[in-house]
Design a protein with these regions (language model features):
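Sec-dependent bacterial lipoprotein signal peptides
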Residues: 1-24
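A domain-start/cap signature at the N-terminus of enzymes
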Residues: 26-87, 128, 177, 181-186, ...
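Gly/Ser-rich "nucleophile elbow"/oxyanion-hole loop immediately N-terminal to the catalytic nucleophile
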Residues: 77-83, 137-174
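Active-site machinery of serine-nucleophile hydrolases
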Residues: 85-87, 91-150
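Short, proline-enriched alpha-helix->beta-strand connector loops that line the catalytic pocket
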Residues: 126-128, 211-217
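Primarily recognizes the serine-hydrolase "nucleophile elbow" in alpha/beta-hydrolase
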Residues: 158-159, 165-211
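C-terminal catalytic histidine-bearing segment of alpha/beta-hydrolase fold enzymes
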Residues: 207, 220, 226-286
């Protein structure tokens, strides 16, 4: 299998420097970090530790053979030593849509996992390869569809040194809806666990029913979400918890009191007190 290697020093430096340009909102303006458009190389030496932003590379659409979307790549310390690593794929919200080019990939670093990594708030002992694809802003639908998520996951598993039983999915808002759509269509084919934030699960449960419970799922939602009402997650999660054939493996719902369409930063930076990373790593695909 072809394996990705370390980002170039230039790409890492450009990305870190461009952190000053990342937006705090969901609109236009400066597009954030810059990086290398080169193909991923095969690494021969393990990556060193240090600031997480130094192990980031932009992979624009069309720059990596077989990649269905442009994406941002983060590799953990030690990657390249031949040890398979867990994979975490982050699906962003609708406000970060783009064309997958170097110009628009920086939008992904506004919030959540990519923001933590770019701001060097991602600890060295967190072992995930993290890949963050960008949705097509020209697509008819706003959110990724199940087969698009599946295609990216399988690309990642083939091109990186991934522990095949430790593939995890997470998403916010539109990305969470895309994750639910994927889980409804593909259940436990690949994914060992999912963390979904501020996305509705009504369509997913209507499509897949109790089969959704074959994958460990931890959902987070704001109590006063004005975009995706909390009932759109409470109702299907309650139905999922009541399933008996099959009974759910591990499904959880955490509702943040007084929170609107948000909740991702306190979830991903663990300030809300829920260690989602340890929880994910506690599950493996069988």
């Amino acid at each position: 299998m072809a394996r990705s290697a370390r980002p170039t020093a230039l790409a890492a430096a450009q990305l870190a420097a461009a952190g000053l340009l990342v937006l705090a909102g969901c609109g236009g303006g400066s597009e954030g970090p810059r990086g290398s458009e080169a193909e991923p190389e095969r690494g021969s030496e393990p990556l060193p530790g240090g600031p997480s932003s130094e192990r980031v590379t932009l992979r624009p659409a069309g720059s990596v053979e077989g990649a269905p979307l442009g994406y941002i790549e983060y590799l953990p310390p030690g990657y390249g030593d031949g040890t398979p690593r867990p994979l975490l794929v982050f699906l962003h919200g609708g406000g970060e849509n783009g064309d997958g080019s170097q110009r628009t990939l920086g939008r992904l670093s506004k919030l959540g996992v990519p923001m933590l990594i770019q701001n060097d708030d991602w600890p060295d002992d967190r072992p995930f390869i993290v890949l963050m694809p960008q949705f097509d802003e020209e697509a008819v639908q706003e959110c990724l569809l199940a087969d698009e998520v599946d295609s990216f996951l399988r690309f990642a598993m083939d091109h990186y040194d991934v522990g095949q039983s430790r593939v995890y999915l997470t998403g916010v808002s539109c990305g969470a809806i895309g994750a639910w759509d994927y889980l409804a269509a593909h259940a436990d084919e690949v994914v060992a666990g999912a963390v979904v934030i501020a996305g509705h699960a009504t369509d997913a449960f209507a499509q897949a029913g109790c089969e959704l419970g074959r994958v460990p799922i931890w959902a987070f939602h704001g109590e006063v979400d004005s975009i995706v009402p909390v009932t759109y997650i409470e109702t299907p999660m309650k139905e999922l918890e009541e399933c008996t054939d099959p009974a759910p493996v591990d499904v959880r719902l955490t509702v943040y009191p007084g929170v609107d369409h948000d909740g991702w930063n306190e979830t991903y930076d663990l300030s809300a007190g829920h260690d989602i990373y340890a929880w994910l790593l506690g599950h493996e695909h069988r």
